[in-house]
Amino acid sequence: MINEIKKDAQERMDKSVEALKSQINKVRTGRASPNLLDGIVVEYYGAPTPLNQVANVVAEDGRTLAITVFDRTLAPAVEKAIMASDLGLNPSSAGAIIRVPLPPLTEERRKDLIKVVRGDAEQGRVSIRNIRRDANDKIKALLKDKEISEDDERRSQDEIQKLTDMFIKKIDEALTLKEAELMEF
């Protein structure tokens, strides 16, 4: 019973960390990265479709993304979707290939992005702590129902705290990496 609670908590914490990493990878740095455009949705035959399902996105060099659209007639819609996004990008089309040059980030914009990333990291920490609280509540309920001893309860809560510390450390490491990436010139 206790092992199931710990396993569930660990899986949920792992998902929280992965969600955070995915979230902060979408934040634009000065370097070209294909996952920068992951959140962009294109109108494809009247249905909103993720960009990566209608085109291939690759980093051409450090400051340019190249988008190869599978259906040439879709190129204008892809350009429009990129311009409508809040990424501040201006794509240029050359047939089926759309090039997206990434302008260098200003110091002020970098600091704003760091604030956003730190806020995302704090949300990740809060979700980890909420998972810890849920697991501890379940363990306390087992103690209350006399299914486990007080020693088992304490031992389990200590193990869950160690899990919590480990996952919060992973969040802090991801944050540190992203901050360093943002401050590179």
UniProtKB/Swiss-Prot annotation:
Its main location: cytoplasm. GO terms for molecular function: ribosomal large subunit binding. Keywords: Cytoplasm, Protein biosynthesis. The keyword rRNA processing does not apply. It is found in: Cytoplasm. SUPFAM superfamilies: Ribosome recycling factor, RRF. GO terms for cellular component: cytosol. It comes from the Bacteria. GO terms for biological process: cytoplasmic translational termination. Belongs to the RRF family. PANTHER family: MITOCHONDRIAL RIBOSOME RECYCLING FACTOR PSEUDO 1 (PTHR20982:SF3), RIBOSOME RECYCLING FACTOR (PTHR20982). Responsible for the release of ribosomes from messenger RNA at the termination of protein biosynthesis. May increase the efficiency of translation by recycling ribosomes from one round of translation to another. This is Ribosome-recycling factor. It comes from Proteus mirabilis (strain HI4320).
